[in-house]
Amino acid sequence: MLAVVMARRSDLNFSLCRLVAVAVDTDRIMKVGLELAGWKKMPADSAVHIKGKNISKVLIGIDIGTAELMLAKQLECDAVIAHHPIGATAVNFYKVFDRHIDYMVEHGVPKKIAREAVEKLKERIETRNHANIYSDVVGAAKALCMPLVNIHQPCDEYMRQVILRAIKAGRTEYVSDIVKSISKIPEFRHAATKVQVSFGNQNNKAGHWTLVVAAGTNGGFNIAKAYFQHGVSTVIYLHIDYGELIKMREEKLEGNLVVMGHLGGDSIGLNGLADRLENLGIETVRVGILPNR
């Protein structure tokens, strides 16, 4: 199977077309996702749910349901890539949360306290997901004979690296400096949900700060509290539940919480994945993903 790839040469002001042979299967797609993060092992929140081969066109989205699978079929896609866990990965999602422990210990939180905070988070999410009906999307894909992959933590890790570089490249004296650096990233710039300081004040000194993403989900109240009580002044989350935020306000913790925005962050990871697939000659249909330019 052949795909046409456009290579731009701005200095000569023309486009060069070249034919590239495409022979990609779902295992190769997963490998590209892992390479994106610099990893070799597939985490518990990512999987090849339905295998496929000879893939030259894929639909990529953050949340995939039956409607997106039908759209992919209508658009003659050969496979679908979801970001958020589906099927068994939605049940096993909590198993990647231990990365929070590594983050906290790295930033001075005693391991025992870090583990206790993460266990509370794992219990809450595991209990919630145990009640979910998790087989519908994979079942629909089987009925449609549509290869299906979901890649969650590896894309989030790529997103973490992009954001970390952006923060370190700018000023970090004040919380507002961090907000400005993140807001310049194209996906956050295009988002309707702007980067905000949900707790604390943007005029505060940032002090010791930490970016807490690519550990499955946000750390909520208990993990933020552990950071604040052990020398971290500014915590950066992708998102936070309202109830967890209220707990922080009621306990009157001292610190700052920057919330970046879920769609903007996830779009960074999926754009990175889509760009690399296109480099292999795969056509991508990006659904609901914010632009990276």
PLM region descriptions:
Residues 16-293:
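Active-site catalytic microenvironments in core metabolic enzymes, especially phosphate/sugar-handling
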Residues 1-21:
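N-terminal amphipathic/basic-hydrophobic helices that include classical n-h-c signal peptides
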